[in-house]
Amino acid sequence: MSIPHIAPVPHPRDGYYATNNPYQVNGPKGFTEFKYLEETHDLFVRLDFPGIQKESVIILLEPSKKAVIVTGEAPKESKHDSSHRKYGTATGLICDCCEISNIQCFVGDGVVRLILSKQKINLRVPIFCSCKITNLQNVLFFCLIFVGGARMPTDASPNIIRGYNPEDLSVELLLETSLRCFSIVNVSDIFHGFVLLIPIVAVAGGHPLAHLRGLNPEGCRGTDPFDPAFTGPTIRPHPSVLEGSTSAYETKQLSNGGLYLRIDMPGVPSDGFIVAVDGNGVVTIMGRAPATMHDSNGFYAMNNPYQANGPKGFAEFNQERDCGYPLTLLEPSKKAVTVTGDAAKSSKHDASNRNNNIHTFVEDGVVRLILSKKKIYPHAPNFCSFGGATIPTGDAPVADGTPYVNLLAHFRGLIPKGRRCTDPGDPAFTGPVVLPHPSVLEGPMMPYETKQLSNGGLYMRVDMPGVPSEKFMVAVDGDGVVTIMGRAPVTMHDTSGRTYVAKVANVPRGYDGGRIKLVPKHGVIRLTIPSN
């Protein structure tokens, strides 16, 4: 029997998390990232070139020292690959008063990272210029200069460096390293076929190079790798691929019924991949790309450090029409519903039981309610909503003279853009700190706890609400890293499903993962890892 491929499918409402890669579920989005470094006034550039080899990288400084061109090749590693891939891109200055003075380049795991420095060459220019960041008119001093069919000046030979080791040399002033430089005869070949990026990235803002979000008032220190503009229903072809496949993956059905897959996961080290098969025979590949140098970082969801995609936050509100359910525990004014429940201490190693602040639709650690309402002030405005939603500007107060008050303002989606639901994809729920659960009245408020056992083993409790018991997987990679993965399906009116990925422990190489004891129950997985 042939092995079928499960093609990636976008979420029906939000689309793919990152339009640059259908398999990316969290972290910085986009093929590139630009960041202004406050402490050095340099520019950090991240370029995703999956499959690229360090020795193939070419750095070219244009003679005027205004532009840097980066090219490299990803060879055909497997006979089943459709072809090799060649990459090319450029970045440079937008002012006339400065020039690029230094380039540092670091290549690893399919990612090229640059640090570009500049120096002023026209001292008569006022202090404020387009290449200086100020707190008033903030303009990033570098910009991408992709132009289809552009030609380099021919009156001077550019200089390039091949195959250098950035650990040995930071490439100080490229034009002065003449012993390692040589000329390219046909420079135009480097630019030939470059893709014009404007149609691809114009959605991110008004500037024609708007994927450099730092050029817009919204962000003055670099691009925004979490920009919602990089989320959508369509996967973009890689704009820097000059030759070969521009897709983030390719598949091939083999003659023996097998399946070949090539998947780009730039930034993931060779030892950072895990393949697991769940109880339904679904093969899942996981890869974690650590933050390197100045890469953007942070938790996808501040409610859970292990959540990788899906609705964020501890609660989600969605106002549906013509749906209801009888309620029995109402606050006397019939304006509020109080929900309580106990999470029992299921293991002797748990710190304590937990009391979470009507058991209606309760499954896998998630309580879902459907609330119905009826109007008691017939003369009130027609527009009204559940607690937390604001009314349009200018609407009159309710019949008793009390104005509408937003008592649940922490539901950011209700103010003022969404009057029908919270926004579980709100960037406000992404950040560097994991928040304690606000509804826990007794017991631990964090989504995990650990305990070192007296026999040298490790006990862990990890919250993955919404994940059924049969949807948990545990794998041990070649470096002995224990990873837990859980997939929470869409239920009732949930915005979408959720995926959790947790690297929880290090065991010796060759450790038998079958020794790990798993107890999944009510959206919580408890595992005991015996010592070797």
UniProtKB/Swiss-Prot annotation:
Domain of life per record: Eukaryota
Stored PROSITE patterns: SHSP
Annotated coiled-coil segments of the chain: none
N-terminal signal peptide: none
Domain sHSP: 25-134, 439-532
PANTHER family associated with the record: 23.5 KDA HEAT SHOCK PROTEIN, MITOCHONDRIAL, 57 KDA HEAT SHOCK PROTEIN-RELATED
Family label: Belongs to the small heat shock protein (HSP20) family.
Name of the molecule in the record: Putative 57 kDa heat shock protein
Organism of this sequence: Arabidopsis thaliana (Mouse-ear cress)
